[in-house]
Regions:
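Non-heme Fe(II) oxygenase metal-center motifs and adjacent flexible, charged/small-residue loops
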Residues: 1-243, 248-283
């Protein structure tokens, strides 16, 4: 089991240890495909392999359409700042358990001993991104403990999460850029099967978002893990070389590194709602 403590990232304005990315949190591709199938309500991939083709609305209850994405919450409904709890499905309880084993705590201060019941996550939000979809820069708000863990699924669909200082990323151009074109404070390349964990100032003092895909995520100097992005681009080398050749033929010179997304990306955002309606469990 990968340990969170071995995968910290350094970012401006963020305390050491408050930002981490485990590249292969789900180490086995077949396991990731099975988890993705469970999340999507039993939708099958071709030949039992990774799910890489776009789908209509995922099957099963609870799915809603929001800003071009299909979303579903498990663990209960958040009304205001209070969770009306309901049982987590088995795939979510397994994920919460694995987060604890990896050292991810959801205490009131954004950490704490993962083994303590009070520090365990109680809510998971699934987002299904069709090709080209992003999410506006946002904060998750005070209803949750100040820590979020995001698991990325979809074998051919990496993404770049961009973080903006509070007030600089509240909308504008295309779904993941800062207001008025503000530059991100830092960005993180999210390969499939990776787990991003952020807490502290990364959670409370920054907005995070993913740009709408208008040809791919262009890698810039804000990226904290450029080597991982370059390795991914190299693995997808044929398309990259073709793009580069076309750029040179058109006299545009060296093309910037661009991360192409596949047709289906699913993220699982795991958090703990601080206030839970006592004595109420919706079945």
């Amino acid at each position: 089991m990968p340990a969170l403590s071995h995968h910290h990232l350094a970012a401006p304005g963020v305390a050491p240890g408050d930002l981490a990315l485990i590249p292969d949190f789900v180490e086995d591709q077949a396991e990731a495909a099975a988890l993705l199938e469970a999340v999507l309500g039993g939708r099958q991939g071709g030949g039992g392999g990774p799910l890489t083709t776009p789908a209509p609305a995922p099957s099963g209850p609870g799915w809603k359409l929001a800003a071009g994405r299909h979303v579903r919450s498990v663990g209960g409904t958040v009304l205001g700042s209070v969770l009306l709890p309901s049982p987590l499905p088995s795939w979510a309880t397994g994920l919460v358990r694995r987060l604890g084993e990896a050292g991810v705590g959801f205490g009131d201060g954004g950490g704490g001993a993962p083994s303590a019941t009070a520090n365990r996550a109680n809510h998971v939000l699934a987002n299904v991104y069709p090709a080209g979809a992003g999410i506006l820069p946002h904060t998750d708000g005070p209803a949750y403990a100040p820590v979020a863990a995001i698991l990325s699924l979809g074998e051919d669909s990496p993404a770049v999460m961009r973080f903006f200082t509070a007030g600089a990323g509240d909308g504008g151009g295309g779904g993941g850029g800062g207001a008025g074109g503000a530059a991100p404070a830092f960005s993180i390349f999210l390969p499939p099967r990776s787990l991003l964990v952020f807490r502290g100032a990364a959670y409370t003092a920054h907005r995070h978002g993913i740009a709408a895909d208008v040809g791919g995520d262009v890698v810039d100097g804000s990226l904290l893990n450029p080597a991982a992005a370059a390795a991914w681009a190299a693995a997808a080398g044929a398309g990259r070389e073709q793009q580069q050749q076309q750029q040179e033929e058109e006299g545009q010179g060296q093309a910037p590194l661009t991360i192409r997304r596949g047709p289906l990306r699913v993220s699982l955002t795991v958090r703990r709602v601080l206030k839970v309606r006592a004595g109420m469990l919706r079945l």
